[in-house]
């Protein structure tokens, strides 16, 4: 049973968010939570909160055991860009893009050992 959670329009660029997200992809839930607690990047607490939310959804809505969950898929999509202006010399203006991200995580149960694949 797949469980999905999503956070939208996070004020961090997708490129920087993917650096953190790539670290936890495919890991068991406990390991992913432990890794995110020690990472210094701005995205780490956001991803940590998202993983905890997905685990709570799995436990509360689907009666899944959190100890048997792993990060099946996690990805970052680009959100809307905020356009800002920065003054330059001679009265000119430069455009700055404030990038945002959408982060999606899909958790699934670990397959049992000896269970047939299908």
UniProtKB/Swiss-Prot annotation:
Alphabetized PROSITE patterns for the sequence: RIBOSOMAL_L22
GO cellular component: cytosolic large ribosomal subunit
A GO biological process held by the record: translation
Pfam families: Ribosomal_L22
UniProtKB keywords: Ribonucleoprotein, Ribosomal protein, RNA-binding, rRNA-binding
One Gene Ontology term of the molecular function aspect: rRNA binding
Domain of life: Bacteria
Quaternary structure note: Part of the 50S ribosomal subunit.
Protein name: Large ribosomal subunit protein uL22
Gene name, Swiss-Prot/TrEMBL: rplV
